[in-house]
């Protein structure tokens, strides 16, 4: 079996500067990925590589397979598994990177710092009873969705490459093993702070929090209350992130605190899915039996997670714990009003509305209620409203929608900008295509069952320009037929 050794990749352009590895040793465990027998390269994201200042074109497929399987690490890599905890479906537990290795932090040519992480790269001390491996299907799924989210303009981790391992993984069935290379602003999670707080490690907690501020929010370093400002900053950007999810009908599916990044990137695409017909109670995750992480519940869960973040850093907010609790409470209680303001602004953009009117909330809610009752497609409804004439589809012909449409036309007349500006705004806010679940599943099934990658590459191509209405996109705009509907998604761990 090959060993996980370092290899020189000067021509590729790696530039590692590993600051997390300089933090106290109990934050992580340093260890190499577990070598694999027969790695094969599946896909490389050359567009992302170019953004990172990396060039894989001079490397052979075998060299890249060795690299992205973890068998041969880039020079300067300093692999480790991060420790963290988390509230999973509301229950606290100790976790950590059970099947992932942070290879190091790469500096891009423009000075941006990103984590390079392997996922499915072998057991670590945090694996609990897991085998440390990942299957090809779920890794391809994360590749598809994360890159689609990026194209949609939503903050997200990215996918750089996938390699198969030549080994089987055992889930409900025997599956092909694979390793995903993930790129992230960092892997600092709310659960990372919870891990240290649970151990009452105030010194370590302060080091971690100072590190997070320096890495992600340097503008608040000189604040008189930097830790309170951190809480407010993370809350503000999480509100923006969740609002963006709602804009495109995205349902994360497993919003545990270990899956909330303080960088405010979308992270960990397990049982995620996109809503077809509008229903605020939509749930896809097979393990979310009570609908905790349903589409419309995501803002409330974000607030709950942020409250856990506030609890974790409470000792840093003020030396008087009662004053600290009051400061945290005031910040968390502001969530609802801030979210409503952000959501309302987003919905105005979806409808091409400029300016604000007091009836806007009731007006927007009226459309959503009609969409739910008529089982209207969430994505296509907003695109149909961009047509020059009243939409012709049968479900638009009822009196309730016609009445709403007339009100919308009147509201547009009150806009502070002309109608072409409204169309431009709507076009930039409402995607033509999303990663519809049945399309994703069809692409994955073709790969897993027939080793046919054509549907995968076609889907990736379509999703790379989601706001352009091209003729070749026609079939990808269609909602699923009844027999095509995906009713459940799975974690894949």
UniProtKB/Swiss-Prot annotation:
Cofactor or coenzyme needed: Mg(2+); Mn(2+)
EC assignment: 2.7.7.-, 2.7.7.108
Pfam families (alphabetical): SelO (PF02696)
Keywords for the protein's UniProt record, in alphabetical order: ATP-binding, Magnesium, Manganese, Metal-binding, Nucleotide-binding, Nucleotidyltransferase, Transferase
Example of a GO MF term: AMPylase activity
UniProt-annotated binding residues for ATP: 96, 98-99, 119, 131-132, 182, 189, 268
Region (Disordered): 471-493
Reaction catalyzed: L-seryl-[protein] + ATP = 3-O-(5'-adenylyl)-L-seryl-[protein] + diphosphate; L-threonyl-[protein] + ATP = 3-O-(5'-adenylyl)-L-threonyl-[protein] + diphosphate; L-tyrosyl-[protein] + ATP = O-(5'-adenylyl)-L-tyrosyl-[protein] + diphosphate; L-histidyl-[protein] + UTP = N(tele)-(5'-uridylyl)-L-histidyl-[protein] + diphosphate
Amino-acid positions noted as binding Mg(2+) in the UniProt annotation, renumbered to this chain: 259, 268
InterPro entries: SelO
Active site per the UniProt annotation: 258 (proton acceptor)
NCBIfam families for this protein: PRK00029.1
Family classification: Belongs to the SELO family.
Function description: Nucleotidyltransferase involved in the post-translational modification of proteins. It can catalyze the addition of adenosine monophosphate (AMP) or uridine monophosphate (UMP) to a protein, resulting in modifications known as AMPylation and UMPylation.
Alphabetized HAMAP family for the sequence: YdiU_SelO
Name the record gives this protein: Protein nucleotidyltransferase YdiU
Organism of provenance: Nitrosococcus oceani (strain ATCC 19707 / BCRC 17464 / JCM 30415 / NCIMB 11848 / C-107)
């Amino acid at each position: 079996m090959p060993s996980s050794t370092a290899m020189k990749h000067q021509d590729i352009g790696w530039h590692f500067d590993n600051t997390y590895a300089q933090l106290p040793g109990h934050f992580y465990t340093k260890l190499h990925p577990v070598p694999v027998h027969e790695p094969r390269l599946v896909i490389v994201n050359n567009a992302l590589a170019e953004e990172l200042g990396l060039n894989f074109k001079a490397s052979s497929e075998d060299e890249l397979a060795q690299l992205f399987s973890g068998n041969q690490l880039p020079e300067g890599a300093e692999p480790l598994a991060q420790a963290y905890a988390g509230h999973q479906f509301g229950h606290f537990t100790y976790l950590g990177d059970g099947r992932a290795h942070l290879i190091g932090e790469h500096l891009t040519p423009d000075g941006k710092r990103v984590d390079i992480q392997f996922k499915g790269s072998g057991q670590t001390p945090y694996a609990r009873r897991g085998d440390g491996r990942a299957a090809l299907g779920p890794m391809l799924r994360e590749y598809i969705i994360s890159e689609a989210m990026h194209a949609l303009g939503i903050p997200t981790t990215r996918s750089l490459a996938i390699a198969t391992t030549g080994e089987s993984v055992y889930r409900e069935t025997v599956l092909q093993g694979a390793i995903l290379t993930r790129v992230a602003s960092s892997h600092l999670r709310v659960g990372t702070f919870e891990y240290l707080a649970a151990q009452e490690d105030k010194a370590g907690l302060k080091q971690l929090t100072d590190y997070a501020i320096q890495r992600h929010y340097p503008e608040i370093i000189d604040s008189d209350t930097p830790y309170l400002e951190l809480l407010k900053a993370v809350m503000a950007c999480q509100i923006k992130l969740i609002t963006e999810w709602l804009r495109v009908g995205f349902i994360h599916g497993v919003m545990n605190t270990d899956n909330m990044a303080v960088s405010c990137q979308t992270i960990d695409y397990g049982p995620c899915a996109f809503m077809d017909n509008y229903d605020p109670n939509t749930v896809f995750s097979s393990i979310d039996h009570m609908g905790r992480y349903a589409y419309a519940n995501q803002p409330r869960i974000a607030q709950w997670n942020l409250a856990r973040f506030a609890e974790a850093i409470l000792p840093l907010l003020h030396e008087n714990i009662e004053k600290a609790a009051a400061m945290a409470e005031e910040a968390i209680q502001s969530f609802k009003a801030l979210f409503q303001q952000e959501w309302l602004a987003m919905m105005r953009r979806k409808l091409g509305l400029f300016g604000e009117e007091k009836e806007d909330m009731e007006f927007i809610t009226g459309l959503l209620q009609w969409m739910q009752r008529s089982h209207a497609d969430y994505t296509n409804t907003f695109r149909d409203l961009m047509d020059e004439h009243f939409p012709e589809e049968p479900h638009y012909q009822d009196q309730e929608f016609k009445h709403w449409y007339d009100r919308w036309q009147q509201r547009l007349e009150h806009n502070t900008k002309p109608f072409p500006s409204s169309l431009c705004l709507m076009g930039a806010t409402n995607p033509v295509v999303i990663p519809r679940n049945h399309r994703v599943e069809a692409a994955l099934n073709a790969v897993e069952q027939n080793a046919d990658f054509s549907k995968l590459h076609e889907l990736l191509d379509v999703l790379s320009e989601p706001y352009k209405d091209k003729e070749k996109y026609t079939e990808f705009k269609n909602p699923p037929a009844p027999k095509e509907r995906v009713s459940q998604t799975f974690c894949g761990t």
